[in-house]
Amino acid sequence: MLKTTKKNHSSTEARILQKLIHFFLTIFLISILYSMNPNLTNVPELDYYNNQTLKLLAPKKDCDCEKTLFFTSNLRNKPVQINSDIYDIIQYKNRKNFFVTYYMGDEEYEQYENLIAQHEIIKSINALGDSNFYLGKRCINLIKKNRNLMKLNNFKKFYRFFGYQILMKDTLYQSYRNMKEEFNEDYNYMAETYYYPHDKKIIKEKFRKYELNMNDLWLVKPAHLFGGYGIRIFESLKNIKAKNYLLTKYISNLDLINNKKYDLRLYVLVTGLRPLRIYFNQEGLIRIASQNFTLNEEFIKNRYVHLTNTGVNSISKDFIVPDNSSNEEANIWNLKMWAKHLKQLNVDYNEVKSKISDIIIKSIISVYQNLTLLQRENNLNDINFYDLLGYDIIISKNFEPTLLEINSGPSIVYHNQLDKPIKTNLLVDTLNLLGIKIYNKNNMFHKQKEKKISAEENIKNALCELSRPRGDYQLIFPLKENINKYKKFFKGRNTKENKLFWKIIQND
């Protein structure tokens, strides 16, 4: 009996040992497979969906473009124009092998989840997964920290290739000044500015004896803050504690709305760098200060007089929230209301808009070399990245625009009935222009090999993009009529893709 018990016990131990060996061997094999393909288990959401119904732009037979997602908005007053010579609108139903997923990287974008869900796009919970597109300001950091995401394919789109450092107030102005030294007459869209510590000697010499002077006002701007935070009227050098700041000439000769200072928040989409494509959205916001403008010394420190940022003015008791697009007393307008304001002053809206487009193009060219260098250093394919930029522009009494700053990743959270359709349609138009592609769930892992896309492929992708519906976006560069005007600013900074792309456009 004892022998039998020992025998059974030994047999049990053997079975347990066998199972343990089998378990660890399985884990070992999975780890090998995962190291060969880190995305193998990165899309768990796909196991819970049998199908998606996707609305697609389907190219005609003679077009080399691929099918891409088509987004719609119920907040648009007019339908988006589709080039029926190139595309059909179709629906994929019950195609269980085709899926589209997205990853939401910031809480700020949560308001748009309902919009995306309406198009049956699946939300991924895995930041390191295989999503088609990634929304959020931290996407570029995801890539830098996780080399597996560097193995990009044509199905992935990441928000923000503009490193925020490139658009900081100090680096943006330095890029502008570098271009101004080379093209003095062309680069004149920013106010006179000095940067500490770079211009330490000049600042000490120029402002050593400066005292507050209503006829010679300057602003102190922290170099690395946004949203109007830390901006104040300059009084004297001894009052500045910051280690990095800008001293900027105060523009006091301003056009006013309802006797108040205002600026423009405009939206610009850069869909690629090689070749460079810049789109200017024809909808935007006019941000109006909450108290009347005055240079009276009594009000010189009043932020509600001198700053236009909505985040600053929204806490003022005088701030009027817009309830529709016709309330001219509100502190936020849309561009149509501003165009009406200009018309009443006998000012040509299109002429002012053309000057703003000129600023947008030149400012992006000024940082172009840094951006392409960032791409090369990180071995990033052009097709995988895009950036939505928020331009802040102020208008003088002579209706000359001046660039205040550029925001990479402007807020697309809506706060009222005026900006809700503007920002919703902005996202819809952005996604349509980007051309989000569907992937085959069964074959997706065969496409994960790291691949350097050729110049010819980049140009083909750019040409397909030009045929997509743009909604409120307008292509402002490159155009047949402005390539020759702007190409001189690429001197020593140009790319093979740009030159080939421009040639195609000019010969079209």
What are these regions (language model features)?
Residues 192-195, 215-240, 255, 264-265:
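Glycine-rich phosphate-binding loop of ATP-grasp-fold ATP-dependent ligases
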Residues 203-212:
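Short amphipathic alpha-helix with an adjacent loop that forms part of the alpha/beta core around
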Residues 37-150, 160-163, 167-182, 188-190, ...:
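Acidic, PEST-like segments
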Residues 391-393:
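Hydrophobic residue at the +6 position relative to the catalytic HRD Asp in the kinase catalytic loop
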Residues 17-47:
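Terminal signal-anchor or tail-anchor transmembrane helices
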Residues 396:
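Short, acidic, Ser/Thr-enriched surface-loop or helix-capping motifs
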Residues 1-16:
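Short, low-complexity, Lys/Arg-enriched N-terminal segments of secretory-pathway carbohydrate enzymes
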